[in-house]
Amino acid sequence: MAVYTHIEDDELATLLARYDIGELLSFAGIAEGVENSNYLVRTTTAHYILTLYEKRVDEADLPFFIGLMEHLSAKGLQCPVPIQDKTGAILQTCAGRTAAMVSFLDGTSHRFPNREKCAAVGSALAQFHLKSDDFTIMRHNALGPESWAPLLASITGDIPDLPQDIRQNAASQLTDILATWPHALPRGFIHADLFPNNALFVKDKLTGIIDFYFGCHDILAYDLAVLLNSWCFDADSSFNVTKSSTILSAYQEQRLLSDAEKQALPLLCRGAAMRFFLTRLYDWINTPADAVVKPLNPMEYYAKLRFHDTAPGPEAYGLWS
């Protein structure tokens, strides 16, 4: 979450008048995140999150994102609930942006989660996959494997503060990944961005999954690979197989992985690391120096990519047949 677009008091008052959610007590921008502008809105009835969708979000995708949250919350998954105004509408206009109000979830995120939190998120991801099985709105993964080569080709010019051969090395890795990508694995709706900052906890209890704005229809086990990449490397950059085995065990208590999914896990982890390396590398070069949100260092995911490249098999993640 972040703030790019600022809201004037009168604009917020006009927006809130459309809802039956009580009187405004306070509102404040939320600094974390990279995609949209987010505000915490506190009224006499409850707390809410107001999201203003920025230019990187395709408005044609908003019915998918809103619909997926509605569908999953109705199925009992802990996630934000979109709030309807007095006419039943969810999408609004505020400060020149399309906007939506969703319920506020208690809890905080943890950059380096413990084992208990890993178990909770592994179980929740499986529930996400199962509960979304009958969702009917489709969305292609705009950052799926077919986008990686064009994205790398678009990264031109000098790469400040990074090894100069990094582009060539990434191209070699990418060629290998794409040549063997497991397209035939089971597919469904995935979160695609379930980093630790998108899971909220009170102590070790998961209180909600947030930020559905990369959600799409793709390989289910790829979603697990994104999770392993973002949850299982410790502060010293070492891979924590205890965390990964905990996530995988908790996931499989809800949804068993097929043998093909298990065998493909190292490749899927390589692909997930490549996806985040490339998007971070692009932002590293193309983000203006005075940008509100600073780009994340792509070398974190390049190091993860190299780890997965040496993984002998699914057992490297604590997964045995």
What do these predicted regions represent?
Residues I7-R18, T136-I137, P150-A192, V202, ...:
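An alpha-helical support segment within catalytic cores of ATP-dependent transferases
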Residues A99-F112, A153-G157, F276-A291:
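A glycine-centered beta->alpha junction motif in the catalytic cores
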Residues A221-L256, G271-P288:
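Active-site activation/catalytic loop segments of kinase-like enzymes and analogous catalytic loops
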Residues A142, F276-S321:
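ATP/Mg2+ or Mg2+-diphosphate-binding catalytic cores
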Residues M1-K86, K203-K205, L319-S321:
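Conserved NTP-binding catalytic cores of kinases and kinase-like/nucleotidyltransferase enzymes
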